[in-house]
């Protein structure tokens, strides 16, 4: 990861390691801009970008970081998607992102 990524430094160690395993050398602009805002948790956030623009990780990386940094019992996140195929794709991605953690991911 390049040395200019302050958003990367905000992420939980497990999430940073996942990013390294992906071979990423930098975050996309949408991720750089979204991560600090999502982590602040003081406002609603809409993330908009072109297809394959990095939206999913712009949301999931800070959400997973928060959950890993602040473990709780019970229900943490409900992520709603309009398409079954998209749910299945995101489920597979989340399983990969959460591998090696105690986090449970359930598609429904």
Task: Give short role names for the model-derived ranges.
Residues 9, 17-108:
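Conserved P-loop/Walker A NTP-binding site and adjacent catalytic elements of P-loop NTPases
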């Amino acid at each position: 990861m390049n040395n200019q990524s302050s958003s990367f430094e905000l992420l939980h160690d497990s999430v940073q390691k996942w990013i390294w395993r992906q071979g990423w050398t930098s975050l996309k602009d949408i991720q750089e801009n979204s991560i600090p805002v999502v982590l602040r948790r003081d406002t609603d956030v809409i993330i908009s970008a072109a297809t394959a623009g990095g939206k999913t990780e712009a949301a999931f990386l800070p959400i997973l970081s928060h959950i890993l940094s602040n473990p709780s019992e019970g229900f943490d996140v409900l992520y709603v998607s309009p398409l079954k195929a998209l749910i299945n794709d995101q489920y597979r991605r989340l399983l990969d992102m959460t591998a090696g953690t105690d986090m449970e991911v359930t598609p429904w």
